[in-house]
Amino acid sequence: MADVTNGERCASPQELFSSIAAQGELVKSLKARKAPKEEIDSAVKMLLSLKTSYKEAMGEDYKADCPPGNSTPDSHGDPEAVDDKEDFVDPWTVRTSSAKGIDYDKLIVQFGSSKIDKELVNRIERATGQRPHRFLRRGIFFSHRDMNQVLDAYENKKPFYLYTGRGPSSEAMHVGHLIPFIFTKWLQDVFDVPLVVQMSDDEKYLWKDLTLEQVYGYTLENAKDIIACGFDVNKTFIFSDLDYMGMSPGFYKNVVKIQKHVTFNQVKGIFGFTDSDCIGKISFPAIQAAPSFSNSFPQIFHGQADIQCLIPCAIDQDPYFRMTRDVAPRIGYPKPALLHSTFFPALQGAQTKMSASDPNSSIFLTDTAKQIKTKVNKHAFSGGRDTIEEHRQFGGNCDVDVSFMYLTFFLEDDDKLEQIRKDYSSGAMLTGELKKELIDVLQPLVAEHQARRKEVTDEMVKEFMTPRQLCFHYQ
């Protein structure tokens, strides 16, 4: 990777912010591979120059997790306040006017994260000795924070752990909900590390018109789907916030520490809270942040507070963890690292993500083979032409075709995926044929998941959700 060019050439504070983040990653990479001192010194000098330019432009010091303009509450939490041509992403709303979906390169700049480039993918392959997951090969996980730092630790035999989660708002999960768990399972397998899975039933109670009994019931049902992804009970702890907060003083102490060091003004700026929001919403971000710190799980880590955390999640969850990364050094903990995924689009198109609240926008894990076929044929947005003649002549548009997008997530064979892309783009393959390819992938995927889920008993769920020592030993 070459040095970032001079800060004065950046067209905006956002671009300058992104340049600093990229240069910071370069410095870390050079140090990790023990590059010559002159090369490291040159990169550090460039980084300091960029930070000076940023301070001159913004009137304040660069902060890694606070992109310029990101703390203004005027439009946060209100997608209607955003220009129709702009993408809008927060933990509750994803919207774009583009049929191609969110512009993820712009989002990297806006959020101040770093792109997962080929160099990083290759480094993961070298570190694990395993072929990169298709989600990495195809840019589905596209952005990160401090992944090089995690790899540095791993290569030096230092431990880390994984943290991901699920907000249980319905009894049935859809195929889009599988994305973080499929990838997290792969990460756990190749790195051989512990995993904690937060079931944020408290969040869903605060945000949705649901009872405590309903959200807790959804937690238990969703836990069965998560377990059915193949996680090892000896390496995985799944917990309900409603349960765990009351039985783990270490977890609650971290929640309180975070709450003390984050102001109401900060959470308003990050999450768009208003004066009419209940106080539970305002305090919830601290609960989602707490699993990022290892001493929140004394039964696993025996009180150690310095074990690095890696969080695979969709990028709409990043605001929670920007806040977490900002507060971590102030309470004496390492910043969590993150791997961000793209959104799984609704059947009707990539302008929004798949939603469990709209049955026609989603392929549920409870759907029958017939329901899957009907939904894909009837609702999946097509990039094909209006007539067969036009399609044969001009070809289809894979960039907007939902069936092709879904195949990029679930079809393992890279060569077959590329052949489908070529055939559809050239007009050799028709929309109906492309949809059949997707149906042939989704039907067995869902059926196999259903078969595994049937094997998950209430006793197995209880075992996964019981606080206990896992098969890792910490001093």
Curated annotation (Swiss-Prot):
Record's keyword terms, sorted: Aminoacyl-tRNA synthetase, Angiogenesis, ATP-binding, Cytoplasm, Ligase, Nucleotide-binding, Phosphoprotein, Protein biosynthesis
Modified residues (Phosphoserine): S355
Residue ranges of the motif 'HIGH' region: 168-177
PTM comment: Proteolytic cleavage generates 2 forms; T1-TrpRS and T2-TrpRS.
SMART domains: WHEP-TRS
Domain WHEP-TRS: from-to ranges: 12-68
Modified residues (N6-succinyllysine): K158
GO biological process: angiogenesis; tryptophanyl-tRNA aminoacylation
One Gene Ontology term of the molecular function aspect: ATP binding
Class of enzymatic activity (EC top level): ligase
Spans traversing the lipid bilayer: none
Catalysis: reaction(s): tRNA(Trp) + L-tryptophan + ATP = L-tryptophyl-tRNA(Trp) + AMP + diphosphate + H(+)
Coiled coil: none
Subcellular location: Cytoplasm
UniProt EC number: 6.1.1.2
'KMSKS' region, short sequence motif: residues: 353-357
One cellular-component annotation, GO: cytoplasm
Classification via PROSITE patterns: AA_TRNA_LIGASE_I, WHEP_TRS_1, WHEP_TRS_2
Cited function: Catalyzes the attachment of tryptophan to tRNA(Trp) in a two-step reaction: tryptophan is first activated by ATP to form Trp-AMP and then transferred to the acceptor end of the tRNA(Trp). Could also possess an angiostatic activity.
Subunit and partners: Homodimer. Interacts with oxidized form of GAPDH.
Assigned protein family: Belongs to the class-I aminoacyl-tRNA synthetase family.
Name of the featured protein: Tryptophan--tRNA ligase, cytoplasmic
Gene: WARS1
